[in-house]
Curated annotation (Swiss-Prot):
Gene this protein is translated from: glyA
Site (Plays an important role in substrate specificity): 240
Description of how the protein assembles with itself and partners: Homodimer.
Chief location of this protein within or outside the cell: cytoplasm
Pathway(s): One-carbon metabolism; tetrahydrofolate interconversion; Amino-acid biosynthesis; glycine biosynthesis; glycine from L-serine: step 1/1
Listed GO CC annotations: cytosol
Protein name: Serine hydroxymethyltransferase
Alphabetically ordered keywords of this record: Amino-acid biosynthesis, Cytoplasm, One-carbon metabolism, Pyridoxal phosphate, Transferase
Organism this protein belongs to: Bradyrhizobium sp. (strain ORS 278)
Cofactor(s) named in the record: pyridoxal 5'-phosphate
Sequence similarity: Belongs to the SHMT family.
A Pfam entry, by short name: SHMT
Gene Ontology biological process terms, A to Z: glycine biosynthetic process from serine; tetrahydrofolate interconversion
Catalyzed reactions per annotation: (6R)-5,10-methylene-5,6,7,8-tetrahydrofolate + glycine + H2O = (6S)-5,6,7,8-tetrahydrofolate + L-serine
Compartments where found: Cytoplasm
Length: 433
């Protein structure tokens, strides 16, 4: 070593070592996941593929900064740049959804909904939400969730004949149970929501209206789905799914009287320091969603969902409610003699990723189910169009028809052949090159 040479210290290594050098096991897992995303068709309705810019923001030095409080009113010094990021996220969210107020700090969809309960209800209060078995969500009153344990959930459901929400039945139930809060929104409902009627029902019984648009927020932002913001007292959404941002939550409202309640419910009510690297990534995603090309994306998501549903219907599969008006659909597998869990595994072996899902009035247990939930946001992001989704429908049918004829829920030769077709298709639409 020469006199001018500087030995490599642990500090130098800490700031310069790549992930592969510092933790090869995690690096290998990430490479494996990237390979999976590149070579599988992602049909999980709650998943998407973020831009490289979102990844860069979320992996930035913003992760180092504690920033309890809100912009201009922090409990820590040195927050001038994270204030810039959070203010940009707030302003962009308000512009994107036409809301007067926004809170971008919720770490997740569950926490944003918990914050609404904390702000507006007392333990033991009655609220209404769509039954999980009919397409609702855990945080809308499932007995295994905090919302169902600490509050009295009165669930509305869908009709047995067409699997649509009966708004007259919702109104009658609201009059009977007198809820303090009514939730519209869900995780597996493929038809439009009548936000105006929900607000009228809420007003008639003196209830607040919460719209959880976590699944279809990107469609609202893109102008292909009605917006709940003018009708709801509070609108919540995740920032991933169809909105195509980082995993996190967002709260929107118009009436200033709620501002202190909702902001205080997030901090200090539920959270401490916000995840500033995620908030920076949210700001990036909101800016992307404000661009004209996002409107085209949202339009394509819906068109592709309709194409996939029709492709499956044409090949003898039942679609719950007969089709879809948004980004997702439920496939009723009972006419094929199949279960959701078996079908999910077979499709995964064929490099088509989806999830088993209960259907309305499903006789099977949640880990079995009689259905599959399919969604189009992720594959649309990578460039799939109507023709590709028609092909995807044929590939799904090829696998499911094959396992329906087999004795053990598998069809190795067909699954392998479909996997090769999937690779040929995904190779035409590469990601993160």
């Amino acid at each position: 070593m020469t006199a001018s040479a500087k030995p490599v210290s642990s500090v130098d290594s800490f700031f310069s070592a790549t992930l592969a050098e510092a933790d090869p096991e995690i690096a290998a897992a990430i490479r494996g996941e990237l390979g999976r995303q590149r070579h599988e068709i992602e049909l999980i309705a709650s998943e998407n593929i973020v831009s490289r810019a979102v990844l860069e923001a979320q992996g930035s030095v913003m992760t180092n900064k504690y920033a309890e409080g809100y912009p201009g009113a922090r409990y820590y010094g040195g927050c001038e740049w994270v204030d810039v990021a959070e203010n940009l996220a707030i302003d962009r969210a308000k512009k994107l959804f036409g809301a007067n107020f926004a809170n971008v700090q919720p770490n997740s969809g569950s926490q944003m909904n918990q914050a609404v309960f904390l702000a507006l209800l007392q333990p033991g209060d009655t609220f209404m939400g769509l039954d999980l078995a009919a397409g609702g969500h855990l945080t809308h009153g499932s007995p295994v969730n905090m919302s169902g344990k600490w509050f009295k959930a009165a669930h509305y459901t869908v009709r047995r004949d067409d699997h649509l929400i009966d708004m007259d039945a919702v109104a009658k139930q609201a009059e009977e149970v007198k809820p303090k809060l009514i939730i519209a929104g869900g995780s597996a409902y493929s038809r439009p929501w009548d936000f105006k009627r929900f607000r009228e029902i809420a007003d008639s019984v003196g209830a607040y209206l919460l719209v959880d648009m976590a699944h279809f927020a990107g469609l609202v932002a893109g102008g292909v789905h009605a917006s709940p913001v003018p009708y709801a007292h509070i609108t919540t959404t995740t920032t991933h799914k169809s909105l195509r941002g980082p995993r996190g939550g967002l709260m929107l409202w118009n009436d200033e009287q709620f501002t202190k309640k909702f902001n205080s419910a997030i901090f200090p009510g539920l959270q401490g320091g916000p995840l500033m690297h995620v908030i920076a990534a949210k700001a990036v995603a909101f800016a992307e969603a404000l661009r004209p090309e996002f409107k085209a994306y949202a339009k394509n998501v819906v068109e592709n969902a309709k194409a996939l549903a029709e492709s499956l219907r044409a090949q003898g599969f039942d679609i719950v409610s007969g089709g879809t008006d948004n980004h997702l659909m439920l496939v009723d597998l009972r006419p094929k003699g199949l279960k959701g869990n078996v079908s999910e595994k077979a499709l995964v072996r064929a490099a088509i990723t989806c999830n088993k899902n209960g259907i309305p009035f499903d006789p099977e247990k949640p880990f079995v189910t009689s259905g599959l939930r399919l969604g189009t946001p992720a594959a649309t992001t990578r460039g799939f169009g109507v023709a590709e989704f028609q092909q995807v429908g044929s590939l799904i049918a090829e696998v499911l028809n094959a396992i329906a004829q087999g004795p053990d829920g598998s069809a190795p030769l067909v699954e392998a052949a479909v996997k090769e077709k999937v690779k040929a298709l995904t190779d035409r639409f590469p990601i993160y090159q």
